[in-house]
Amino acid sequence: MLPAYLSNPFAAVFGGGKPIDGGRTYKDGRRILGDGKTYRGLFSGIFCGFIAGCIEIWLSSRGFEIMGINMPVFGPDYKSALIVVLALASGALFGDMFKSFFKRRMGLKRGASLPLVDQLDFVVGAWVFTYLVAPEWFVSNFTHGIMLTVIIITPLLHLTTNIIGYLIGVKKEPW
């Protein structure tokens, strides 16, 4: 999950510039995504998440472990592993954009809180993209127990990182 976990904060850190929706509105008159979703954020977030995954692949190939736990293996070979890592990183940001689209439809402004949805949108996006490109890998690695753990721990991690982002001035709201 590290590629997914890291793509969002790095998109916020390195984002800015031209919005993905180009300032356009949907048929309801509201912005499609809003100013918070930019090309620079999208590509830098995917890149940073992908690099984090590549580091994990490298560490795993060398038998690295943390507290007796082996690093994840993202696929049977490097090509498959790179595809999974890219799916995790990009799926996270597309999940976040999907959520933003629906928040705009609900009339919620940029930064408005939508509890649990704000914390799990990128997880769902990462899982969907990963399942689409590597269903066998996904099913064998994201067991019910792992998924439940991710669903429980992610909101806590999300809140912590958002508070840090708020304190250092990267985010305008601490959620």
From Swiss-Prot:
Subcellular localization, as worded in the UniProt entry: Cell membrane
One GO term of the biological process aspect: glycerophospholipid biosynthetic process
Chain segments annotated as transmembrane: 41-61, 82-102, 122-142, 150-170
UniProt-recorded Gene Ontology molecular function terms: CDP-2,3-bis-(O-geranylgeranyl)-sn-glycerol synthase activity
Lineage top rank: taxon: Archaea
Major location category of this protein: membrane
EC number: 2.7.7.67
InterPro entries xref list: CarS, CarS_archaea
GO cellular component annotations of the record: plasma membrane
Topological type in the membrane: Multi-pass membrane protein
Keyword Lipid biosynthesis set for record: yes
Catalysis: reaction(s): 2,3-bis-O-(geranylgeranyl)-sn-glycerol 1-phosphate + CTP + H(+) = CDP-2,3-bis-O-(geranylgeranyl)-sn-glycerol + diphosphate
Pfam families reported for this sequence: CarS-like (PF01864)
UniProt keyword terms in alphabetical order: Cell membrane, Lipid biosynthesis, Lipid metabolism, Magnesium, Membrane, Phospholipid biosynthesis, Phospholipid metabolism, Transferase, Transmembrane, Transmembrane helix
Family statement: Belongs to the CDP-archaeol synthase family.
UniProt function note: Catalyzes the formation of CDP-2,3-bis-(O-geranylgeranyl)-sn-glycerol (CDP-archaeol) from 2,3-bis-(O-geranylgeranyl)-sn-glycerol 1-phosphate (DGGGP) and CTP. This reaction is the third ether-bond-formation step in the biosynthesis of archaeal membrane lipids.
Official protein name in the record: CDP-archaeol synthase
Organism: Methanosarcina barkeri (strain Fusaro / DSM 804)
Name of the encoding gene: carS
